[in-house]
């Protein structure tokens, strides 16, 4: 976060860092641009530690940079926290990402007389930038351009110098950075949430573009020093959307946001002629009909949305689909060409593993469609088209509403392809779309009856292993339920297809083991019967079984049954997921973990 303007810089910097806490961190620090010197304060631990260390009689300072760090090179200590400074203490740098060639830079700089005080890769940048600033006669922008040419890796950098403290210079490469335009003040941050209280005017920054802000101006240059046009856009949500709104945690608020988020993602995407309308795809009818295969690429929770996409696309559009883990994708030899459509799913639009996979797919000639929740982020910019979900800001690290809107988005893509390829009739497409329109109310119905579920959950607080079973399209839901419990409550949890029980996982069942089974819908009768058999298998071995089942479905052998509204099989993941989110949330609260910022996790994973 960087600020320069008329007000005391401490306030927007600390408030901005607080809004970025959801991204995860283990230390925090600031550098304030006092004349002829810099005030540096940094502390390991939470932002409150930094605030508590600031002197009460601080003079008013009008510019500065602030940072929250996840340890990569060097442990989470005061010494390794950012900002890092040159040996004169007049230039400070903060950094997200990884500098891959920092060791060779450090050796070169030490040989020329620089002294290092930390274990980080970032400190090499501070010393290098200081040397290059002297070579460029005090021009920090020119020095930053020269510095970037020496660096390998993925990074965002901000720098400030005591000789010109109201000027802040930044650059990004494969890591997020955005500028904010205020009234006589300007901002730089890794996320617009940091400055949303002050302005809704933002400026998009591209790869290797060097941005310089002063109180009255924002300028952007390429690495050759050529000026670039500002690409301004308006932030479409307000500060209230990033507040808890009376809920105990952001995650709980975001669970209750889901009916509106789903509705907002659906609105306006059906034409007056009852056709799915996705002009955002930027594909002709012939191009959609020529698709031979689809690869869905994602990480974490978004990967589970991709698994749901496979069922929907193959069922409705009759196109073969592979679902790929982004971090693995480019390290094998994926079959992808000009007849392939690659769907890249990301909440943040900045996931580094996914960005690298997108670039790999594009280099092979594939068309890339991003499904994303964050406007003007990197993955949508580098894709051929983007379908934005409209979940609003998701602050809790564990994804909830973004996940459900990703599923709804891939339903829309599936129906559009089916419509164009005529694998479904117009009437079938219309009926499915109208059934989707019922999903917000059905999710609301689940949330209105949440209290018995919360009470039930407390009976499982002491279980240290929970197994989730699903069949067919409910298998991704089982995986998501297990992931949520791992993320939030730090409990060993696994998701399995019900049919795989006898191939190994049933050995884990002992007296008192918690098993959550998701019963398929009545229109999947064969799977429904199989899952009921699985329930009997684990119950016979002492498991405590909770079943998520559609209203009216017969359930035998369960200790507890959680009812959800009836819907078609392919839409059931949206409804079956909600009780699992609540289950994980309540277990985490009861066990006293940090629900919104679980240990070791970051909201946006911007390094490989």
Task: Name each region found by the language model.
Residues 1-249, 260-292, 331, 444-447, ...:
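Conserved short alpha-helical segments that host acidic/polar catalytic motifs at enzyme active sites
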Residues 92-96, 255, 599:
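C-terminal interaction segments
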Residues 163-164, 173-177, 183-184, 202-246, ...:
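A SIS-like phosphosugar-recognition module
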